Amino acid sequence: MDKHLSPGFASYHAQRILATPNVVTITEVALGIITLYLLGSYIVRRNSLPPGPRGLPIVGNVRDLPTERPWLFWAKHKDIYGPISSITVMGQSFIIVNELQIAIDLLDKKSAIYSDRPRLEFAGEMIGWNRQMILSQYGERFRTMRKFVKEFIGTKAAVVQYRPLQEIETRYFLARVLATPEHLADHLRLTAGAIFLRMSHGYAIDTEKPDALVNLVETAAKEFYIATSPGAWLVDQFPALQKLPNWFPGTHFKKVAAEFFEHNMEQADRPHEFVKRRMNAGTALPSFTSRMLERGLDEKDDEVVRWAANSLYGGGTDTVVASLSAFFLTMVLYPEVQKKAQKEIDTVIGTDRLPTLDDRSRLPYIEAVLKEVLRWHPIGPMGIPHRVTEDDVYNGYLIPKGAIVLPNLWMFAHDPSQYHNADEFKPERYLETDGNVPELDPHALAFGFGRRACPGQELADTNMFLTIAMSLAVFNISKAVDEKGREIEPVNEFSSGTVSHPKPYKCKVTPRSASAEELIRLVGDDHMNRPTDANDL
């Protein structure tokens, strides 16, 4: 055969070689290279993340997720992996932050890329909580909503005008507690609802019987915690499940979502339309909603105001209730703190009047009690998750675009490098005395970070101060007793929701003296005969 092969023969010979099973084709080589590249990229990416437990193939760390008290679960990561760690579940990266300075470095200093929220299919898309500020995606709509709320209550100067409302409603709270102390939790909710609904919509609650709007807000809040429970809803991992027909097995979540959606829309729509009717009739009281609507907003901004107002009373009410419930619990658990606080009030204010916000600067121990309530058990112990919108690198670790960042506020508040004997309730830690350097003010961590920090913290802070100071001025708070006169130890546990409330506990609330009871009764008759807007809702 001629050693110089013709082109046709060479082509035929090459085809035979490529058709041989044992010969690797160019396509196979390319696929192998691509596979190795992707696998290598994944390994490098995984190794570049903050340290964390090794996951399973495909599902990752699905077995490493907590079912309750996540703040304690994630706090253990700090001992094992350090102050920043990570897990990956179904391809989704989670970054757990257990040190305050890291949270500040990321969520405050780099808030431009750390201010988004994760997309929650069940709570956000199906129930509509992504319309409210708490789960709204970061963008123009969120910025407008936050701007409106901050303008209304975002500064000390802005909240001064609401002092009379806060003080009178707190006095009404004292009267209700005096009448039925066994319903303390209900009185806390009613008072918070009265303040925030008056501010958000100019709405006067019903004090004679359970108020329909207050109940609706509370129902929606409870459903929010159910809807946002981590890992509870498979549709969050597999959004395509929404498209299954309602009769298909396993789609009960669609019925639940429809019910929750109705309650969520109703709690936003009913008070908003109430204000519009009152404005048309010329009888609307000044409020956040009426002030915004007077600007003649277009349909787009009208919708923003509707949900900004919902954020104002919905978010504000529940967080204040949780904090004040924790306050009453600590007074039962730490009676020596209560005695010191009462002594300060008696010395500075006397016993013939109630403390007011004007007295705040003269009551440093009461101020310290408030701070310790915020620290001892942060009512949002895991904060609200942030989502990073760009790849970032922190201390050599990759935080990939789309990662969900979980700031462990509880760990920040129990960091032994910041707070000694952190599990103890010790207001003295904030006082500057001989030999004592004040520890970190928990306001630095309790209200969130960056552009997602709570815009209503000034208002919440003044509400808490008034309730704490006035309650200690006139009430003794102690352990409840059973029918045989034996003291009942209060339950010292907290729920695992986004807002963490003390679990139901019993306590005894009694007037400190006859003169204290008289101070309470000065407003008692007035609050029982107040007009209500409940019938016009």
Swiss-Prot record:
Pfam families: p450. It comes from Ampulloclitocybe clavipes. This is Cytochrome P450 monooxygenase claR. Disulfide bonds: none annotated. It comes from the Eukaryota. It is a single-pass membrane protein. Pathway: Secondary metabolite biosynthesis; terpenoid biosynthesis. SUPFAM superfamilies: Cytochrome P450. Its EC number is 1.-.-.-. GO terms for cellular component: membrane. The keyword Endoplasmic reticulum does not apply. The gene is claR. GO terms for molecular function: heme binding; iron ion binding; monooxygenase activity; oxidoreductase activity, acting on paired donors, with incorporation or reduction of molecular oxygen. InterPro entries: Cyt_P450, Cyt_P450_CS, Cyt_P450_E_grp-I, Cyt_P450_sf, Cytochrome_P450_fung. Cytochrome P450 monooxygenase; part of the gene cluster that mediates the biosynthesis of clavilactone A, a meroterpenoid that features a unique benzo-fused ten-membered carbocyclic ring unit with an alpha,beta-epoxy-gamma-lactone moiety, forming an intriguing 10/5/3 tricyclic nested skeleton. ClaR, ClaS and ClaT are sufficient to produce clavilactone A. ClaR acts as a macrocyclase to catalyze the oxidative cyclization of the isopentenyl to the nonterpenoid moieties to form the benzo-fused macrocycle, leading to wigantol. It catalyses: (2E)-geranylhydroquinone + reduced [NADPH--hemoprotein reductase] + O2 = wigandol + oxidized [NADPH--hemoprotein reductase] + 2 H2O + H(+).
